[in-house]
Amino acid sequence: MNASNSRVATVRVVPGKYRPLICLLTACSVALTISARAGGFLEHTRQGPLKGAREIVFAVRGMGPDNHWYANFGQYSPKRLAGKSLFTNGASLRVLNLETGQQRTLLEDAQGGIRDPQVHYGGKKILFSYRPGDTSHYHLHEINSDGTGLRKLTDGAFDDIEPTYLPGDDIVFVSSRCKRWVNCWLTPVATLHRCNADGGNIRSISINIEHDNTPWPLPDGRLLYTRWEYIDRSQVHYHHLWTANPDGTAPMTYYGNLEPGILMIDSKPIPGSDKVISVFSPGHGQKEHAGALAIIDPNAGPDEKGAARRITKAEDYRDPWALSDNCVLAARGRDLVLLDAAGNEERIPVLAEDEIKAGMFCHEPRPLVPRPREPALADRVRPGEKTGTMVLVDSRHGRNMKGVGVGEIRELLVLESLPKPINFTGGMEPLSYGGTFTLERVLGKVPVESDGSAHFELPAMRSVFFVALDQNGRAVKRMQSFTGVMPGESLGCVGCHEYRTSAPPLAQHPIPLAAMRPPDVIRPVPNQPDVFDFPRDIQPIIDRHCVECHNTEQADGRVILTGDRGPLYSHAYFSLTVNGQLADGRNRARSNYPPRALGSGAAPLLDKLEGGHHDVKANEDELSTVRLWLDTGAPYPGTYAALGTGMIGGYESNEQVIENDSSRPETIAAKAAIDHRCSSCHGKNSLPRSLSDEIGLSFWMPDLNDPRIRRSRHIVFNLTRPDRSLMLLAPLAKSAGGHGTCRQPDQPPGSGQVITNRNDPDYQSILSMCTAGSRRLNEVGRFDMPGFKPRPEWIGEMQRFGLLPMELDPDHDPIDVYSVEQAYWKSLHHHPPPVPQH
């Protein structure tokens, strides 16, 4: 080793070989085979909780094929990727003796997977996730630290990973038993679960519809874990740190969730302090949680940016374990490393050359030593209860509530974020155009007292959030996170997005008015669906009040609001979105908007329907429908069965492979016609040249201010009435029934005659492409078309979940996808155990 100014020293530990170059790392109280150098760790005294430790347990395995931090178990959803696993084969569980350099293998499986070792409090056994080579699922296992006594704790057609012991010897882990898929990818979700020490009595302790990760006990007995969420905001910016009691009660932000960016994961307490060590994985996170190491001091609150300090510049560290406040054990690439709080580093290579060539890496190093148990927190869950209660102290209290008057908030709209039974790509289509990724259910409303307080029951184990409503039922403030209660839990909050370090405000009444009475029961909204579907629920209202002026013949304001279908969406849905009529959260890295900025409180569409647009005036039932649709994220379909189907030029695994028409004969001819008649004015990137051509617009984060969006494929092609496509009407002369809006460069304005009659060969070529697309859409079907059939993958999951019969014949047996999904969501509800009969 070059011992000049290098910050990195190398410890060479090769299996079967030992070089007695020993110095004492007193900061960690362990001896390492290391080339001696002055300073660094040697200046520290023999302190810390691991005095006398001599061994480290770690896992060896390859890296999976997917770059997402969470996508390392299970398989991809699309049928065309059937059999493509998210893991690699070949793994071992090993122990390294830091004094001798010798390694011993506790378990090895050339075709299996081993991950997430955790040492028991007594230091004599190891908990880990193991996938035997002839299987496809990880389950919890234990093994004695001498390699004896391997025993399987859990089983089933699900994956159980990232386990940790609780002080009473129960186990918390994350599991795909939650039966849901990532809202923006094609992989399964895992959330927090708990079981007994023997693997029995498995129960969910999470209400998340997205991923939870890497739970770990804090010194006070709470769990620290990563929670990923996106309620009407960016799907790639909010995966930060939360705490909860080991029974799932009292979920609370620990660090993050307001400011966007960074995946915070693999966090663990630093002995002797209030701080934690964490991986800050850049952006949306890296494969196997790789990132920079950071120390977080939570005492300033969850939103204090300066409370986190990175100790490494490089962003390729994984699985840290704080041995003291100045020594961290971690994995880095193929090696183990030790670092101090200043980022000085000692490398410990442990893999043989043949293992490196085989693509193996080190993972999850843990000191093999006893450690003290955290305090065991008493369970607060009452499994026999169907509900819990929520108390809101003052709905006007918050950090962005300026202008909200006393008594202005009259009710809370209670919404539920609904999990997906399947998903196929990274975008939100066709659920929305750049907006929501999920469906949201209306549970109902509860009253707010004059002092801003509310007290109400919530159904247990459901992911809920609230919209504060005024006297007209319009949104004043919208929650962009979720909460919920465990069975029998009583939960409280101070206000709306209040500072987590603040106390409740002084009030006229020492006790909130709502807390002085029994909790309200959520009142369903009469005459309204609970999950909205644009063609079914909103288009009829648009037809009655808007289409007379906004159709393919008249198109006032160049806005078309007919229910005609484009390649992915109806023309009305697309037009309302891109013309800024919905005020949804979009896919933006932004939270805590000002009052009346989102949903029904800001949507121009609602202003128009309430009487602010010529003589348009919807009735109260219609207005209620539109308000609720807006406040549930303004989705296009009301079913997840629409995902991955009913689209021309749709996306699967971020590739435009669903019915892409670009190479079809009709499209090739139409491209030539569009080039011939349109490119001299519009160029080649301003108008779509096929039903699948995005003309450079993002499919998952479109810029609504981009002028090209008004000429998008979603509006210029009509697959219900191909001859009413704007791509045909705009250049066609008025005398031939067109709009005549396009003209030759040498023609005066208003004299548009690029195409003079419908027999023009170029007109016929474009019409043939639209007709072929219409014909194909009728063949494959869209969710709102008669005889619609969901994808086989959707059917397969519903069969796996026991909601459709295995003998179902999808080609002949009718499927009510709306009813089946209602049954799916209901199957995930908390069902109290039966009362014993005496």
Where are these regions (language model features)?
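Sequence signature of WD/YWTD-type beta-propeller architectures
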Residues: 39-451, 457, 476-478, 482-484, ...
